[in-house]
Amino acid sequence: MAPQNLSTFCLLLLYLIGTVIAGRDFYKILGVPRSASIKDIKKAYRKLALQLHPDRNPDDPQAQEKFQDLGAAYEVLSDSEKRKQYDTYGEEGLKDGHQSSHGDIFSHFFGDFGFMFGGTPRQQDRNIPRGSDIIVDLEVTLEEVYAGNFVEVVRNKPVARQAPGKRKCNCRQEMRTTQLGPGRFQMTQEVVCDECPNVKLVNEERTLEVEIEPGVRDGMEYPFIGEGEPHVDGEPGDLRFRIKVVKHRIFERRGDDLYTNVTVSLVEALVGFEMDITHLDGHKVHISRDKITRPGAKLWKKGEGLPNFDNNNIKGSLIITFDVDFPKEQLTEEAKEGIKQLLKQGPVQKVYNGLQGY
């Protein structure tokens, strides 16, 4: 073999060996940098899981493989120990570890029966009985509304499991009509089957991951399909987390805008001042006033409000209302005369209907 061909062959061999050892690029699969936080990894998985789910891509022969790669990437990068091993040794360093079902990972975010693509509730077959839905209020802070968050909820869920023997049931949904009198009828379900497998309800602990999206509004609901009350003859209902934004001690939310009040001294109101307001994510909003600030004056800081739920790139305003703290102690006659001389302002005593703007 010529030296040049031998060199090319060796380089190709080294490349193939490196590829085998390295395995799949989990960061590339999730579309995140190697410095990505756990929050970024969860957001990326949640977004891609909806796009790549095989049920949503029935015509793609590689859909199942892509979905499995996505689940494997999330399982490793969301676990600090596995991620450390992967960063050091590649996928080969994880071969001896336990791997979760990718369906389990998906249900961790969306529920047992997956996410209803298109955002519409699942269509219920009227012939299949269904357990009750459960609605749970989930309290979130204004800080979480601003920046988003992932909240883990541990739920003890009764699950129908097979039990020995048979049971009587109404799986065929047959009805009996009984006439009670003229124009009065009663319909009852008829138990016509005694051959169905027996079932029992067993409590199982499940950990669900609720994504608090930036800009989420009070009263919005996050559904987890099949995580509601079970039904021994059918399918379980749904679990819905209803967002309840708790009050904040500094900011008040109105739509995408934030409101707050700032109290300044009389001296600051007259001569000006500078100050910083600590925002919900810790960054500072600088305020500088070099003119007179009257009680009730408002200052708009555009882009310093909450992110819009539908488009996080758009943010509302921060509206600051100023209050003036007047001195508590009484002024001396000399001080009063000094103020009169300084301000050179005569009496202004006007009586009017302020509510009408006159």
UniProtKB/Swiss-Prot annotation:
The modification Phosphothreonine is found at T188. Residues 1-22 form the signal peptide. SUPFAM superfamilies: Chaperone J-domain (SSF46565), HSP40/DnaJ peptide-binding domain (SSF49493). Transmembrane segments: none annotated. Keywords: Chaperone, Disulfide bond, Endoplasmic reticulum, Glycoprotein, Phosphoprotein, Signal. Contains high-mannose Endo H-sensitive carbohydrates. Cys-169, Cys-171, Cys-193 and Cys-196 form intramolecular disulfide bonds. The preferential partner for each Cys is not known. One of its GO terms (molecular function) is unfolded protein binding. One of its GO terms (biological process) is protein folding. Pfam families: DnaJ, DnaJ_C. It is found in: Endoplasmic reticulum lumen. Residues 25-90 form the J domain. Glycans are attached at N261. GO terms for cellular component: cytoplasm; endoplasmic reticulum chaperone complex; endoplasmic reticulum lumen; extracellular space; nucleus; protein folding chaperone complex. As a co-chaperone for HSPA5 it is required for proper folding, trafficking or degradation of proteins. Binds directly to both unfolded proteins that are substrates for ERAD and nascent unfolded peptide chains, but dissociates from the HSPA5-unfolded protein complex before folding is completed. May help recruiting HSPA5 and other chaperones to the substrate. Stimulates HSPA5 ATPase activity. It is necessary for maturation and correct trafficking of PKD1. Part of a large chaperone multiprotein complex comprising DNAJB11, HSP90B1, HSPA5, HYOU, PDIA2, PDIA4, PDIA6, PPIB, SDF2L1, UGGT1 and very small amounts of ERP29, but not, or at very low levels, CALR nor CANX. Binds to denatured substrates in an ATP-independent manner. Interacts via the J domain with HSPA5 in an ATP-dependent manner. This is DnaJ homolog subfamily B member 11. It comes from Mus musculus. The gene is Dnajb11.
